[in-house]
Amino acid sequence: ALPILSHYYDTDPNYRNKYIPILDVIEELATKFDNQERYKNSRVLKSLSTSRKYRYLNTSLQEFTRSKYHRDFTKYRFRDLTEKFLQDFVVWIQVRAAKRGNTGDVSGKLRKLKAVCLYAKEQGVYNVNLNAFGSFKEKLKHRITTPKGVSPEVMQQIESFDRMLLTKKEQFYLDLFLFSYYAGGMSAIDVCLLTRDQIKDDQIIYERTKYDKQARVIIIDKAADIIERYRTEAYMNYVFPTIKRCNPTQQKLYGRVKRINEKVNETLQKICDRCSIKSRVTWGTARSSYISKMIDEGFHPLQVAELAGNSPQTIYRHYYTISDKEKMKGKMNDIF
């Protein structure tokens, strides 16, 4: 006769929890981030985008186990999370991503899954095997993003675009992009939530929403002109007419920023089409273009890092791109 394990009938939830399915731990982490609050620029924000990524990981794993093993992911415990499982998961992501024409963010998913294992181990869950990630060291590294910057000539074309060809709202969306470019490549959420108390004399001092970094932006004349243009249109204490409600929920706040981001990108696409600009220009282009221009103009990386709210290493790894390769080639020919 088979021995009956004493803990089989144990009803103590703390004890049974040691054999919790992977899916439940991921959901537990997502809920934790749902409720995790951060204080940024006099505003309490929750980590909703992080919790969404964990839920997306859960969905991906459910699709993977159904497709590859014809098994329901709800039945998977941490003992099932082996090196072979991870290898199969990586290949499945890559094959699916190739069909969809993207990268599938393999490293992002693996890092999240490893974070789930670390969290489970801290909680005392049984059979967590962190060694399974041993052969994925390269894939666990942060993927170096392709710089999205464009040449100063392209930015000049966008700046000098005939505004008569744009509606009043499109002119506003263009101004948000240009302001971001002039103000250290400020992200969409930071521009939309920018308030007057963050402006000190000729500087904008703010904590970046996405990262724990403070930026100290010098307000150049072109940026000051855009601020002045919307002074009478902005609501409450905001610099731009972006947020219209007094105390919107964070869901509505993020939704509003996302819609404005989309409108800015649509306006930029319209301008690029009219000017026959082949480069892909989005709101995110402003940051790389600003950083690349500043470094090419001879500003010290430490100065640029303070203005943009980054470290010099991050600037070179993620944002800097050679803006004028022909000019560089000419100089190199002279040197050699």
Sequence positions of predicted segments:
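N-terminal helical hairpins
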Residues: A1-E28, K32, K40-R43
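N-terminal core-binding DNA-recognition domain of tyrosine recombinases/integrases
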Residues: A30-S49, N58-T145, F161-M164
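Basic, Lys/Arg- and aromatic-enriched nucleic-acid-binding interface segment
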Residues: S107, A132-A188, C192
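Conserved tyrosine-mediated DNA breakage-rejoining catalytic core shared by Y-recombinases
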Residues: S135, L193-R229
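Active-site/catalytic core of tyrosine-dependent DNA strand-transfer enzymes
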Residues: M155, I220-K278
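Short, basic (Lys/Arg/His-rich) helix/loop patches that form interaction surfaces
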Residues: L166-K168, E233, N265-E306
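Short, polar N-cap/turn motifs at the start of nucleic acid-interacting alpha helices
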Residues: D197-I205, K278-S279, F299-H318
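Catalytic-site neighborhood detector that most strongly recognizes the C-terminal catalytic loop/helix
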Residues: R208-D212, C246, A308-N333
